[in-house]
């Protein structure tokens, strides 16, 4: 085997006693044991195949060694590929195989990377196992592994002494050996063995390795090295010889000592000539021995075969192989058949030589000495067609030794029949087949010519020793011989010895020259000859001479050459007595002798000059201070030298092969086995090469002078590819090795390294050799880790893409804000990081994309971290500025974030590239991270830490500020926004921590994997977990957590047929569809279209209020005046089933136009149709009809819209609706115990009114009320608005000041509770139109007929719903939709009965008593009792379950459908998604009460009230408190009208004091009003600042309310003037409703109302004055904005809204001549007592001025307010008992 960093051998303990006695004792002990040698077998399996190991029954597998990789180029190499790595090893192969096969009879293991990993990508690997079958009984007692052979020396220093004596071999051929010679293994890599073995016999020289005798004694190594490097292997000296035998002992303590007699042959060899780096012990052979007496020291006679890695720096012999030929069935007969073929080498013919013998012959070319070459057995490349995988390889034994042979010859070795078990026939048959795996080979690559010396050099050596010889002549002759003659290994030793001898003799003779100049000239000439000789030895032509030497001799020759040059140079330096610089430059050496005067030294001394040595850019710099300290007599003498090709000689001790010989050796040899007992440190030993030229500097001859200041060296790398880890070293003359003591690496890059040393000598750079087959990061992962990383990255990428698509596709859901832009950028950066990481870990460092991936990944990580910092800063700035109440796209700030994030990141990366591009390209870590140098920490780690610390700091500050604000924040918009910001901060902080943990684990994993640390696996699995969690967190936090996005997901799934049906048929999805025109701004709604089933149609398009579609011209002739040139929405869906899937299956998807053409749709276009907008869902409703949330459950709050005349719809395209929450109604709920709730809401045309309900607990309920205002565009944009865009948070209102129309609808939250009981049929009744109900002859029959029809229709619909819907929630929702359908236009709505019909009063009272409240909280589903009667004129209304719960009461056209519907309670939760298109939380508290946009709109309501409730068709105030025109005029008469001007408070007053009614308003007045309107809108923006309001307090809201009341007065007057009303409140007493009917006045269609009625406006300003009069003693009592819509107690209910104005006026005149009036309660912020909600008796006392024909009416008030949970709260005033 050829295992990296593996050596075989155990410590040998030699005995100094009598060897024969110990041998005899060992023999006796071994005879007691079983003499049967163990059988070792080898099994192979190529990559992708299974390795099967099987033993005989009763035997178990005992694994010795195993490896998954490649150490041989021949195994599993059918095509002869020589480019594969043969230094491939998986360290845990034996561990993995033990877990599968140890102590089993048979096992099978797949040889694949999934099982063992991939140690060398690109190389076809194989699994090799060495094992033996042992009995089961032996396994129970034997725990130690088999011991190596006793002759293996694992920790011995050189076993040869210093000497040169040689013994010539005998002429007869070597005797035939019974077995192959054993191999003594020495650590050729891993340091100095602790013991020395001294050879004891003659030495025969072999090419590349010496055959030497092994001594019988061993000595302790004198001590360890202290050079800072691993000690080199001690090589074998060959100078002292003894004839003692060396008994050896197994280190494992096996029984007996094995003695090697004098005639034992032990094969040893030292790689010679620089080409053989294997350390092989030489063979000791007795020249006169005979085959009969020859014996082996051990049964494991093995071959020691060195090998190298194919790296360019040369390979390293890692192991010494032991082949047990006996176990393989190869005996003496087999060995005799193996010979090395004849060949030519070094001008010699080497004849056929038997394996194990050494061929010795005289040196070539007349040189003195002998040449040697050895024949060994090595594995060969298989022949074509020969399948070597089916054969077993001879197994190497490293355990139990055989007993030594006895003198009698009766030992087991020779008498194999007495000891060896009988060999099976099959085994003998396969012997020849096994032998085919091996072939004899000459080792080493070149013969050993160490003892060969040329005659010329012998002559020069004799001359230099003579006394009168001329040194100059000898030096010249030496240089001539070395340059022109062929030298051998022995010549190299002689040459360096002559150089040293000349320097010693010149030192003695220089005193004989009295003249200084002559002395300098002679020494200079001598030095020139020496330099030329040294250059000749280093020349390439003499490379073969160096290869003739073994590694040790090479080092000794090189050291001798360096010291000889230095000694001769200092001879000249010491001779010079003045400042001088002598330069000797030859081909391979540059020598400079400098003598400097200390006083002239101005700076540091640098060598060499740029023009002196063009071969290299190396430079050495000596500090000035250090030179002066080492001066002598005012002179400093320095010797500099630079060498070329010396680096190929002075190789590190770990690398004994040069590149050429290493590759050749690997191709021709194969390691047959390896020792698996080597420790992990040896296995992980690095391969190092000398990667720079050698440069030297000296201040004293041969002295290692310590300097006070270190010198600086700049050394150029010879090899820049596949090398790493530079180390500054110097050549230690004593150890003949490189040492790092006193030197340090200051900096390095791809081409150069800068070193610093505190002494002077010869310097160079050592570097690690990286395998030429580059490994990507994934090659270091095991199979499981690789799969996990793929899965983790894939999950994270998918979720990031989903989040990005959600932000893009559902952008209508999100309010475009800075936070949205920040998170979009974060997702983009994270996506880039994940993808680049996945690409980078698959690349190799030599890939062209490696540098680009690292650069972009650096930039992406910096940008992503910066965006997290900006997100934390944005949260902080939101809390510390006015942005808390806004959610808009702050474009300048976001642009600044973009600039800082990407700009800074790109700048940092550009600077890093400019400083050191190789950091990203050639020296990075697996194409993912930069090289871990100073630049990495400055440009990568430091910015990330800065951004991270800043993000944490801002998050901490934000949390502190938020805690403070939460204690003082108002329970409105600010509180809601604080809750949102708190949630965002928490989630962002968790996100930041999760991302930081993910990246940190990835970083530590990459670093640990590179260094093969065990903890790297832990970091790897943590990275997988955190990366997966990060992807899930992004999806949950930014997608699933948002309710609006969940709804959009459901809607998206429903609308795409390509998705699976299981998703589209989800019952949790929204069951809705909208049919409407696809009109643009200014378009007209197509109206409400119903099919035969009566389902409500809905539209997906955004339509403005009061718009219609010209696509319905033919089908809707009555809408001709509302046409718009936009086509109808062909994709609109008519819902006829319970869900979209059912609808699709029933083939009921039809467009509006197709339905109209088919005649199955009956379009109903109510006058003043409006579109309620919720996201992309709109519902088209008629005026006076309540609309529920398209997506919420049944029973949502309804909005009532007053109709407008048709001609006004086109004139007012910019109308919008405003929500005015009240502070006091929410802050101070009305106190009291049990109160009865009644609904006095009348819905003309909406299905009747709601009567008095049963007793119920006091409770506030949700309701919405809205205002309307013109969009008078004056060119100046308001805050929060943009051209053509709907602002996210406009100041003071919820409309866009720029767009023609925008509608906002809010829906509360509900939870489902138990349903109501079905009321008796008697309570469910409908009421006819006024014309039929007032006709006494027909009314009874008509009511009975209508009641029966409604009951049948209700039963049919209930059956249909039960079949279609599977959940109570959807059933209730569809019931509500059907209820709206009937009220909206399914058929003509029935009005409430006249108040004088006693029979209906009794029925309503009976139903009220039967129904009771079942829930503490009820929603504001005020439409459920609509169809139960319009009885507000009688002071009665239907309440209870029929009022508040779905399907709870009887119905007519507009009544509740069904009595089993569930009840939905209010959920006080943070429902950010309940507001759409704007969020409820977007109300600015300051601006809602200050800005004129949100307050001036009430003026139109006052105008409408002043004109009379019947002025409009359906002009009653449903659900609110309305005063008659007489009452209003009486109150207005008491007010003083200030002059009309545009002042802060008085700009709305008119200077016209006429009390007469004015039908028209001049154009100048209208223009003046418009200008004043705009000025008010702008001036009121800063009301908070001008009035000095505190930022957050209850007092702040009270003061805002006071300012609001003042604003009401002036805007009310202006609105009257715009609508043609008198400018004061003092109307004549004789003014009545009839006058209003006679003079209809166009207006803006004030939008107020609750529960199916028509609201006309808030009487806040008027009521405030009225209440001040009634409560003169209580000036603090005031009327809040929530006091709305109390029905008057005079006059009957008004006609339906869908009747013509003439019909309504006629019916009103028939019913009552009185106008509608009402009283209202007021709310005080201190006690909130009820002042005007009395019973009908109290009303008569409190309002005696009312007409005596008026019916007693109980008034109720409804109000709405935003609570702290972002929910619109309703407050329904109870009737006093």
UniProtKB/Swiss-Prot annotation:
For membrane topology, the record states: Multi-pass membrane protein
Q: Which UniProt keywords apply?
A: Cell membrane, Disulfide bond, G-protein coupled receptor, Glycoprotein, Lectin, Membrane, Phosphoprotein, Receptor, Transducer, Transmembrane, Transmembrane helix
Q: Which stretches are Extracellular in the membrane topology?
A: 1-786, 842-847, 916-940, 1010-1016
Domain (GAIN-B) spans 580-773
- Which residue windows does the record flag with biased composition (Basic residues)? 1271-1280, 1734-1750
Per UniProt, the ranges with Gly residues bias are 1243-1254
Q: Which residues form the SUEL-type lectin domain?
A: 45-134
Xref: PROSITE patterns = G_PROTEIN_RECEP_F2_4, GAIN_B, SUEL_LECTIN
Q: Which residues lie on this side of the membrane: Cytoplasmic?
A: 808-820, 869-894, 962-988, 1038-1777
GPS, as annotated region: 728-773
Site residues, Cleavage: 760-761
Q: What is its main location?
A: membrane
Q: Where is the composition biased (Polar residues)?
A: 247-266, 284-303
Q: Which GO terms of the cellular component aspect does the record hold?
A: plasma membrane
> Where does the record place the region Disordered?
189-304, 1096-1127, 1235-1257, 1270-1300, 1344-1369, 1511-1596, 1684-1756
Concerning PTM, the database record says:
Proteolytically cleaved into 2 subunits, an extracellular subunit and a seven-transmembrane subunit.
Any GO MF annotation of the entry: G protein-coupled receptor activity
GO biological process terms, semicolon-separated: adult locomotory behavior; cell surface receptor signaling pathway; proprioception
Got any disulfides in this one, which pairs? 728-755, 743-757
Family in the record: Belongs to the G-protein coupled receptor 2 family. LN-TM7 subfamily.
Output this protein's name: Latrophilin Cirl
Q: Which organism is it from?
A: Drosophila grimshawi (Hawaiian fruit fly)
